[in-house]
Regions:
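Active-site-proximal, Lys/Arg-enriched surface segment
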Residues: 75-164, 169, 174
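Short, hydrophobic/amphipathic alpha-helical patches that form generic packing surfaces
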Residues: 37-46, 144
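Structural motif
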Residues: 27-35, 133-138
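Basic, low-complexity segments
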Residues: 1-27
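Short, contiguous clusters of charged residues that form electrostatic/catalytic patches at enzyme active sites
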Residues: 38, 140-143, 189-196
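Electropositive nucleic-acid engagement tracts
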Residues: 31-32, 43, 47-120, 220, ...
Length: 276
């Protein structure tokens, strides 16, 4: 395909074609569909560098055509009108169907990931803490929503976190072509928007999982509750909660979860084995 080498059997190639056909329904013309297929193959295929220029170079048997293919990819990613969220949703449903053939999707997992950078021009980059590096570093941060079975997980939605240093800088916004309607949103805000989209789309899942960066947020926990979602979230021992009765009414004064755990005693807890 496209002059690029792939280690793929016939069944794999058929699945790949089925995936491209599903995504093709979201794209308006043959040129967009061809550009999407070329870019996706470049990301999935061999070669360490995954930007447009090396993808174009690997795809072209004739070096004279490389500039044309490179420009085609740039136009598709930067200027060509297509709904990236719709593409992501169709891709997610396609992949979830494949996961469910092996075992059911049980959980949603929210997390953020840092992408280390050298310069200052990548959209959203600044010195900020990232758990990926375990320190403050020059990086972009993306918030992701993944679905998970007992043995596999798959990211289905993603939002780039834009710090105020980008949102409040008109020159940076113009250069990066950040849409005028994009306002500052915290990582919690981004995570909740993805959850709301997943609920609206009917994505399967039983329990929302996240670490304390999200679990410490009352807004996050309360929004999940209002959406009717069960959750298991990381929180810190000093975090205070209210005990409630069967009717949901608060009882007494708030208590830290650390003290509550001590009062419950060891018999109230059990270990849940992790599946490798």
């Amino acid at each position: 395909m496209w002059g690029m080498a792939y280690k793929m059997d016939e069944a794999g190639e058929q699945r790949l074609r089925g995936f491209f056909e599903a995504i093709g329904g979201c794209l308006r013309d043959k040129r967009q569909r061809a550009s999407f297929a070329l870019y996706a193959l470049g990301i999935l295929g061999e070669g360490e560098r995954k930007s447009c220029e090396p993808i174009a170079a690997r795809a072209c048997g004739d070096p004279a055509q490389m500039d044309n293919v490179h420009n085609q990819l740039l136009h598709f990613l930067r200027s060509s009108p297509w709904d990236n969220r719709l593409v992501r949703l169709v891709a997610a449903k396609y992949a979830i169907e494949a996961l469910n053939e092996q075992e059911p999707v049980m959980n949603w997992v929210l997390d953020d990931t840092g992408f280390l950078k050298q310069g200052t021009h990548s959209v959203g980059v600044q010195r900020q803490y990232t758990g990926s590096a375990g320190k403050t570093a020059n990086c972009q941060i993306g918030v992701s929503l993944s679905v998970a079975t007992r043995t596999a997980h798959l990211p289905i939605d993603f939002e780039l976190y834009l710090p105020r240093s980008w949102i409040d800088d008109p020159a940076r916004r113009t250069e990066a072509k950040i849409p005028a309607d994009v306002t500052f949103q915290t990582k919690i805000d981004l995570a909740l928007r993805m959850v709301e989209r997943a609920v609206a789309a009917g994505i399967p899942g039983e329990v929302v999982l996240a670490d304390s960066a999200y679990g410490e947020s009352y807004l996050f926990r309360e929004t999940l509750r209002l959406l009717g979602l069960d959750y298991a979230l990381g929180i810190h021992a000093p975090t205070k909660v209210w005990l409630v009765d069967a009717a949901g009414s608060q009882q007494g004064k708030p208590i830290s979860v650390g003290k509550l755990a001590e009062q419950l005693g060891p018999k109230a807890f059990r270990r849940i084995p992790m599946v490798a």
